[in-house]
Amino acid sequence: MINAAQNVLSDENNQIGLIYRAQSPYQMAWREWSDIPTVDKRNGVFSDYGVLELIDELKDSKVIINNSNYYIEPTRAFVAIDVNTGGDMSFAAGLKANLAMAKDLPRQLRLRGLGGQVVIDPAPMSRQNRKTLENAIKSSLRRDTIETNFVGWTSMGLIELQRARIRPNWLTL
């Protein structure tokens, strides 16, 4: 095939023509795309690439980020998220934990297939930092592929989100 193409290119009259016609699109695809990517068919590929560990992490409601963690608990009415700072109870640690959660939250909700009303109980922080956290959450939600609206703050200091339900919760499958 390559020799035929080189002969056509070296032709002096430079007329455009058909080199070889395929009998079907299937045969043409095999001829044109003969470099087949290798497929790993070994047993245990999921464990080799860490997929099983990621699935185990999704089964647990606890998500560990930096020196803090947060819990994602789906209920019948809404998805509850509780952010914790660990041992450090300072407002700075609370803000740091909340910002880390804001960055990771869309990914966790997407992987778990969670949607509907989402209520976040942020770690303790000063009222002046609410706008910072709100902007961080909105920024990370804008980068997500699933439509999520920041509804606002409740009088109790909780954050409300409304997220589109794209697929069922993966734990119910």
What are these regions (language model features)?
Residues M1-A77:
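Extended, charged alpha/beta regions that create polyanion-binding interfaces
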